[in-house]
Regions:
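Compositionally biased terminal segments of proteins
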Residues: 1-215
Length: 215
């Protein structure tokens, strides 16, 4: 599969056939890279969301771990909460998270065997929402890459607002997107073979250009 780092590529098909991933959708940079191939991605981040108000978010980490053990060596397990667990399998980080929010992904995209991925717009919206809590250059680069496909920045902002339950405000999202100084390129980023050689200033300018266009 294109868009995967070599060590992730080695286990990807084995992960895709697991039963335990069926309730989940692959999100984040890897789901994006599989679709637009603008850089390699390493981590496999799986999410599911609540479907009713009475539902209690939780992850069946024990059965997930048992299935992962059938395809390789688990180097570590980090049980962050009952709704979130992270594994390192054969050098690849896999996370499983059951979100208390409702899903922003209207139509998951079948990818390989049991593995489904989020659509590009939803990935962009989720990245905007998570950028309120972290300042990873990869997220900023991914927003730029999505915009280069022609997807509207205003459409992603709208989805991000809905996803947050409208706790986020448009002005907060735009303040972060137009402040490239918050994002510092990490040393390992170039190892991911990005196709765009851009600085934070380049990305900031392009985002402002996109924002200046009509909604």
């Amino acid at each position: 599969m294109k868009g995967l780092a070599p060590h992730t590529q080695r286990i990807f098909e084995s992960v895709a056939v697991l039963e335990c991933i069926k309730p989940y959708i692959l999100v984040g940079g890897t789901a994006l890279s599989l679709q637009i191939c603008t850089r390699q991605s390493e981590d496999l981040d799986f999410m599911k969301w609540r479907t009713s108000k009475d539902e209690s978010p939780e992850v069946d980490w024990y059965h997930i771990e048992k299935e992962l053990e059938t395809i390789g060596e688990i180097q570590s397990r980090n049980l962050l909460d009952m709704d979130h667990v992270e594994f390192v399998l054969e050098g690849v980080k896999l996370s499983f998270y059951s979100s208390p929010k409702y899903s922003p992904v209207k139509e998951p995209i079948p990818c390989l065997y049991n593995l489904r991925i989020a659509d590009i717009r939803s990935i962009g919206a989720m990245k905007m929402e998570v950028m309120m809590r972290r300042s990873n250059f990869r997220d900023y680069y991914d927003i730029y890459s999505i915009l280069k496909t022609g997807i509207s920045i205003w459409e992603m902002v709208s989805i991000a607002l809905d996803y947050s339950g409208h706790r986020l405000k448009t002005k907060n999202i735009l303040a972060i997107l137009t402040n490239g100084a918050r994002f510092r390129r990490d040393e390992r980023f170039n190892q991911l073979s990005p196709i765009y050689q851009v600085t934070t200033e380049d990305i900031e300018c392009y985002i402002k250009e996109c924002l200046s266009q009509s909604k």
